[in-house]
Every structure is written in structure tokens, then in C-alpha cells.
Amino acid sequence: MDAQAAARLGDEIAHGFGVAAMVAGAVAGALIGAAVVAATAATGGLAAVILAGSIAAGGLSMFQIVKGLTTIFELPEPTTGVLIRGSFNVYVNSRNAMRAGDDVSATCSGLPLNHPLWPFPVLIAEGSATVYINGKPAARLQSKMVCGAHIKTGSQNTFIGGPTERVAFVLDLEEWLHTGLEALGLAALAGGLLLAAMAGVAALVGVVAIGGLMMGGMALLGDLGDRLGPGYRDLFQGVAGMALLGFGPKLAGRRPAAVTSETAQRRAYLNNKFGRSGNLDHDINYRGNRETAAKFFKSKDIDPADAESYMNGLDFNHPVRVETLAPGKNLWQYQSPGAPQGNWYTLSPRVQPTELGINPMGTNRAANTIEPKVLNSYRTTQKVEVLRSTAAPTDDFWSVKGQSYPAKGGAQQLFSNEKGSFGLLPREGS
């Protein structure tokens, strides 16, 4: 550490504006983040990433702005206390020299926004690790007090060098808050990259490219600030950070360019085909559910054409998962009269056919008549792997030839092509 002015009896302590700046910036960031979430209709993980990133960016940017302005214009920090006592035999400028771990400030007001009035003596917690006075580290300008304040005035002609030694616990709210905001920002960055990766390679590349440009721009502003003098790096980077944050709601609420009817229809078709809704969190879940179903059908050697037909009967807006049923599990299945056992089962006999995406009527092929479907009961005879899903609203055109029935879907269903794992139970009274 560069040599700093020696602290003396009567020198002042201060907290500065760091905590107040970070709190104000974090509040502003939270409001801006909420506006972005509202403009994009983001939910879940995406909303959390936006809010966390906005809070961190707002707090850290405002801290840099205030720090830069204070340095450039030498803005006075409000005095919160005065050093008392001091060495009994070492003097600086005819005033008692101050020692860490021994000497104190009479009180500390905690202004602005650091802590309530500290009505009892406040110990000096830091000093030089190489210069000692009466066996104690010599206190100097910027040495911390146990309340988190620092010594703000010192000798004009006596300086003390060496690294800093801390001899007491410091209630450093400013440092803790700054570290917390940095951690929050890194967590938001990691979450954003994870969501982008789940959305696809193109999204991940775009996020990385934009992030790289922003970091490069901040580095250039910092270099420019260093050339102009102390404080300008913080000021330039802080202003840029708040400006980028302020543009967020405008960019999020920007209306897309007008498209032709043909383009709109093509876009709607692709969005429906690939489960794109504009809600990233929803889209990630949708694609994950679809991938789970596709992998299951492939693992069971289902013909690709049949698998695609089965996929059309699943509502990927709801969870899709693979489960293993134990022996003795009761299930039910609707079948046309005289038809063989199928692959789809329901968990409750109270579920209606239309809720399973099928017509309640079926064709009795032996009599060539249209009759209500029969509900048969089954019980698992061994462990069996099934696909649990929710039936999608669909038009059943296969139950009755020449008819299309609009089934509403919405019920839970299980799929398995291992028919030998399900034993048909006798009907009651038979």
C-alpha cells in the first residue's frame, strides 16, 4: 500500500457514500428489472436472472458513479466522529499519534445510511503492518474503524507506508454489500448463460457475443478514464452501466417490424411445431418434455411414423416423464368392443374418453356397428417402464371411420407397449 498520512489526535473519521449509493442503485435496478420482466412477460428462471442482474448492475454502477465524482471533485465526506486518546509518548505535528487496537473515536454517527448512532468509543481496527507505535500498528489515512468507518484526515507532512494489518473485527457493511452485489451479478450471468445454452447454440453464441462486446466496451472506457486522471474510470464505467440498464425496458418493449401475411403464417407454423411461445422459460420446458417423449419412444423401438403420431397426442405444455411402475398397480383402458389391448392407460376409472384425447364411441368390427367404448381394468404383473404425460386436445379420426371427434384432452395418461406386463382383470359380477 502507498504511504498514507499519519493519523493524529483530533483527526476525523467518515463512512462515505458507498452504502447509500449501492442501496439507491439497487432499488433503481430492481424497478428497471421489473419493467423489463413486465415488458417481456418473462417468468420463472428468466425473470429471476433479469431481476438479479438488474439489481447487481444498478447497485455497482451507482457505487462507481459516486466514487468517481467524490474522487474527481474531492467532495467532502460527512464527518461521523473524531479520534481521541492516542500515544502517550509519540507525537505527529505535536499531536498524539494514533494506534490500531488501542485508540478510538469518541462515537460514530454512521451517516449516511451505514448504521445507527454508535454511542460508545469506536476502536481503530487497522494500521500499518510494518510501522508500530508503542507495540501497536500505526494508524493512518483510510485505516478502518470497527464500525466500518475510515480515518478521513491526517498529517500533511508525515506519512506511514507498508501493507495493512487488521487487529479487530470490522463491521464493514460497504464491503459486504459490494461483494454481495458482485456475487449476485455473477450468479445472474451464470444463470443467463445456462438458459441461453438450453435454448440452443444460436442463443448461447448471441449472449456470449453481446456480453463480450459490453465487457470490451467497459474496458475501453476504463482505459480512457485512467488517462484522464483518478476517478474517471469509475465515473465512465458507472455512467455506462446505468445507461445500459436504463435502455433495458425500451429494448424489451420494442415492437417488431411489420411482416407480411405469408411470413406471419410461416412463423406461426414454426412456432407451433417447435413449441416457441416467446416465453423462454416455457419454451425450455416444452422442448425438454418433447425430447423426453421422443427418447422414450425410440428406446422402445416404436416405428418413427407411429412415434410421431403418438407425439401429436401429448400436451408438451405439461410435464412428461418416464416412470417405473411396481407390480400390482391398477390401471384402466378404453377399447372399442372386441378390440385388442392397446398401449394407453388411464390412472382412474372416472376419467372420460374425451379427456384422454379419444372418441367415447368406437367400431365393433365383428358386428360392424358403432358402440360406446368399453372400460377394461388391468394390473401390472411385473416392473414396467411407462411414459406419463397429459393428453392433448385433438381430433380423433381413427375410432370411427369417416368421423372426426374433437376430444378435449387434459387428463393424465400412461403409455407402454409391453402388453405382457399388464394383466386383464375380470369384470365385476363375471
UniProtKB/Swiss-Prot annotation:
Main location: membrane
Keywords recorded for this protein, A-Z: Hydrolase, Membrane, Transmembrane, Transmembrane helix, Virulence
TM annotation in the entry: 17-37, 46-66, 193-213
Transcription regulation among keywords: no
UniProt GO cellular component terms: membrane
InterPro entries given in the database record: Ntox46, PAAR_motif
Superkingdom of origin organism: Bacteria
One GO process term, biological-process aspect: protein secretion by the type VI secretion system
CDD domains recorded: PAAR_RHS
Molecular functions (GO terms): NAD+ nucleosidase activity; NADP+ nucleosidase activity; toxin sequestering activity
Membrane topology category: Multi-pass membrane protein
UniProt subcellular location: Membrane
EC number(s) reported in the record: 3.2.2.5
Record's catalysed reaction(s): NAD(+) + H2O = ADP-D-ribose + nicotinamide + H(+)
Function, as annotated: Type VI secretion exported toxin that acts as a glycohydrolase on bacterial target cells and degrades the essential dinucleotides NAD(+) and NADP(+), thereby inducing bacteriostasis. The activity resides in the C-terminal region that is initially neutralized by the cognate immunity protein Tsi6.
Self-association state and partner proteins as the record states: Interacts with Tsi6, VgrG1a, EagT6 and EF-Tu.
Protein name per UniProt: NAD(P)(+) glycohydrolase toxin Tse6
Gene: tse6
